[in-house]
Swiss-Prot record:
Record's protein name: Porphobilinogen deaminase
GO biological process, one term: protoporphyrinogen IX biosynthetic process
Other noteworthy facts: The porphobilinogen subunits are added to the dipyrromethane group.
InterPro entries the UniProt entry points to: HemC, Porphobilin_deaminase_cofac_BS, Porphobilin_deaminase_N, Porphobilinogen_deaminase_C, Porphobilinogen_deaminase_C_sf
Cofactor binding annotation: Binds 1 dipyrromethane group covalently.
Cofactor(s) required, per the database record: dipyrromethane
Keyword annotations: Porphyrin biosynthesis, Transferase
Highest taxon listed in the record's lineage: Bacteria
S-(dipyrrolylmethanemethyl)cysteine sites (modified residues): C240
């Protein structure tokens, strides 16, 4: 029997994702026995400050990649939103699983919705992207950093450290945690980050058998859409924790029309000001250039200056009060 080793983070959500992939592989390839190599990433260890203030990239992926390069794992399962656009030599982002619900959700034990939060209410989030979009909509709120795994964040909410918090819907759904929260509201006005709600399958590049197995996990429409998002991020030069939102979708095909793909993006300061929105739609056969085109269009409108200033704001000790 063949053995295949999956590198995974040791958090509850990461393990759910890894076991999900393990089950899919063993079902499709009964001759393969899958083992998990559980690893604690740098991002899991840094709990005293926002990752946006740490600098660098790959906080949740580098240790898994090191295990593959060292020969201790054949593939790694990542939340795609955590995977930098640069993949180390000798590795390959081979497959992307079908994307599920990308929503960000408002969670509270006291208030039914974002609109019901009073002025000055405290909202918890780790993400500069969420902070940016929240404060653009509700500049009267106070946003505080929220670290820890999903269960830790929910505990802090229940203890009353926050009036509300914002998390990704998909993690709560996968861990069956939505039933424990009285008030849940999907924030439809939020644009998600690159790759949210999809899994990235990274492999050792010179192993054709592992590639054959991994490719059975790939969902081509999701692969195309997330490539547009990753191309955009690569050209803009933003890291996974920058205040940048981008989302590509394939448009519903009408019988008499050429299929199209659309992408929308948003860049701004973490305090919800200096926001730049833009979207583009092209025929599906031009998807390979769509991310680059949108990035270049936003650069022409000042995106790089906005990102530079956003980084300065995020790193300043005397951040604005609402940060």
């Amino acid at each position: 029997m063949e053995k295949l080793v999956i590198a995974t983070r040791a958090s509850n959500l990461a393990l759910w994702q890894a076991y999900h992939i393990k089950e899919r592989i063993e079902t499709a390839f009964p001759e393969v026995r899958v083992e998990l190599n559980e690893i604690t990433s740098k991002g899991d260890k840094i709990l005293d400050k926002p990752l946006a203030l740490v600098g660098g990239k790959g906080h949740f992926t580098k240790e898994l990649e090191d295990e593959m390069i060292a020969g201790n794992a054949h593939l790694a399962v990542h939340s795609l939103k955590d995977v930098p656009t640069y993949i180390p030599e000798g590795l390959e982002l081979c497959a992307i699983t079908e994307r599920q619900d990308q929503s960000d959700v408002f969670l509270s034990h006291t208030y039914k919705s974002l609109s019901e939060l009073p002025e000055g209410a405290v909202v918890g989030t780790t993400s500069l992207r969420r902070r940016m979009q929240l404060l653009e909509k509700r500049p009267d709120l106070k946003v505080k950093d929220l670290r820890g795994n999903v269960n830790t964040r929910l505990r802090k909410l229940k203890e009353g450290q926050y009036d509300a918090i914002i998390l990704a819907y998909i993690g709560l759904y996968r861990l069956d945690l939505l039933k424990d929260i009285p008030y849940v509201e999907k924030l439809d006005f939020f644009i998600p980050p690159m790759g949210q709600a999809a899994l990235g399958i990274e492999i050792v590049a010179n192993n054709d058998r592992i590639r054959e197995i991994a490719m059975t996990l790939n969902h081509e429409p999701t692969f195309i859409c997330t490539k547009v998002e990753r191309d955009f991020i690569s050209v803009i030069g933003a890291g996974c924790s920058a205040p940048v939102a981008v989302n590509a979708t394939m448009d519903k095909k009408e019988d008499d029309k050429v299929p199209t793909i659309s992408v929308r993006a948003m860049i701004g300061y973490p305090d919800g000001t200096h926001i730049l929105h833009k979207s583009l739609t092209v025929p599906l056969n031009e998807a390979d250039i769509l991310g680059d085109e949108l990035a270049q269009a936003m650069i022409e409108e000042g995106a790089l200056d906005i990102l530079e200033q956003a980084e300065i704001i995020a790193f300043k000790d005397e951040m604005p009060e609402r940060l």
